[in-house]
Structures are given as structure tokens and as C-alpha cells.
């Protein structure tokens, strides 16, 4: 099925239907997780590194269609199904009046697969 192909990026496909994959990415170092895509032909990659405790969910949005070839790597505090569903799942974060919450993450590029381990 398609679930096993979440990390496969094929040629653009006519009629491809966009998909969202929910990934449980474990913390690797300093409670951070990361996701990356690397194009061996172009020798170019992009990564997102995030605090696993703050960002409890991660979605990969994938569209491999002709003229619409894109992927989104999306750390989040809830799944992208809306506030109602987040409330039902106990994931909706409510801030008190004037309360602030800061979330940080890192996005970067790399040119060598081996350098990914140093992120």
C-alpha cells in the first residue's frame, strides 16, 4: 500500500491524490527530532529539526502530481484535522489571557548525506 511508500519520491504521476502521513519520529539528541529529504542527483537536502516535547505531532504532506509536485514536513502541536478533533483527542492547547508560549524549530539545507548526522 501507499503507507509503506511515505518516504519514496517517484516521478510526477498523472491523477496522483495528495496524502498526509502521520509519523512518530523519536527524539534523537537533546530531546530533538528531525526529518530530512535528500536528492542524491542534485546533492542537495533540506531538514527540519524540532523539540519533540513541544511538537508532539509530525505530518508529511505529499503531492506527487504533474505540475503539483511538493512535500511538506510539518512538526505541530496537534494533527492537521482542526480544533474540534484536537479538543476530542486532548491535544488542543489553550492559552490563558495574555499568556505566551514560544515554539522554535530549525530549518536548513545540506549538500552531503554524511553531514546530516552532525545536525
Where are these regions (language model features)?
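Active-site pocket scaffolds in enzymes
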Residues: 36-119
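Active-site/ligand-binding surface loops and adjacent short beta/alpha elements
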Residues: 1-47
